[in-house]
Amino acid sequence: MRKVLRALCYLKELCLMAFFKLIGAICRCCSAKYRELWLVCERGNDARDNGYWFYRYLKEEHPEINARYVIETDSADRAKIEVLGGMVPRGSFSHYLAYYCADFLVGTHVQPCAPDLILFYHLAGKGIRARGKQVFLQHGIIKDEMEWLHRKNMYMDLFVCGAKPEYEYIRDTFGYPEHVPQYVGLARFDNLIRAERKEKMILVMPTWRGSYYPTGEAFRKTAYYEHFQSLLCCKELEQLLEQQDYRLVFYPHIEMQKDSRRFKSGSDRITIVSKETHDVQKLLMDCALLVTDYSSVFFDVAFLRKPVVYYQFDEEEFRKYHYQKGYFDFRRDGFGPVCTTQEALLGALTESFENGMEMQTEYVQRTERFFPLHDGNNCRRTFEAIARLKERNKKHAAESESLSVHL
């Protein structure tokens, strides 16, 4: 029965695809609204990441580009897009039409701007795609092995890389044509470098643990819960914060926030927050120091030359539920000390206070090697990379037309 329903779902989407392709062809000829369209999106319910910052760049620096942004009408970030103009309500008729009309589909996740991510992922696996060139902006720097993003499993026309070692890893192991992965820098880093500030705040931001990690009441028995709950109620930590007049903000990964209500703070200086109330990028800009386990957000903080401390109490278990290790080794390549116990973590925090919350020279040198592009021009380079892709397509089309004439 499940197979029948899935087949009917595919059939429905194929019919919709044929319909919108036909209507789209007409709209591109008759309406400037859908001609040479760049469609931009993140998860579909937000505007806080590389998609938003690149879209904002397009609207402010290249108003000649016909760009639109897909977002849910009840999103907390809707106003940010309305100010810029070009909002497309997610899942609407205009979303489907724009998706099939667009020359470029630009997003932070695979199958960028798709009305139904999972369905279009499976359709793409069968070679059924929209006409638009797919630009993958990413929503973080890749450090682990992600075979599902290899060329044999995923189609992309432009794969944006945010760091030099990441680019080299993707170029050498993911199997894409040479021109697809490009090191141009993440769009959101432009805002980081322009708006850097530092408050007396420690940010604790652990990553998620995979789809099969225990949830509900079973979550309380996990090492993840036990270690971070212990930290949130640690008297030594509270005393350290009091002595330094600091506060601590605990922001679990979005995928873990369904269980974040189970965490309790042991101090007025320790706050547990979520995506409903706080913007991740603002937290990263505001913090003086980041504590994380394996989350790639540490790249953002390291990009700002702020101290990072890794709290990795469950590395072996983590790999059972999460991605396997890639090119990045935390002890060899990381931007701060690796702690496996709460005692070691408190020691690292104490040392950071003694150093004036400045990143140590050894780690600064590592960031300089990792991020040779550090100039606030990532959006511009991304735009230029898409423009080159556009010219490449024109050249290919002209060559194909010339060949057909000669034949």
Say what each PLM segment does:
Residues 49-55, 187-263, 339:
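Conserved catalytic-core segment of nucleotide-activated headgroup transferases in glycan assembly
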Residues 89-97, 254-299:
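Donor nucleotide-activated moiety binding/catalytic core segment of transferases
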Residues 263-265, 296-370:
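Catalytic binding pocket for nucleotide-activated donors in carbohydrate/polymer assembly enzymes
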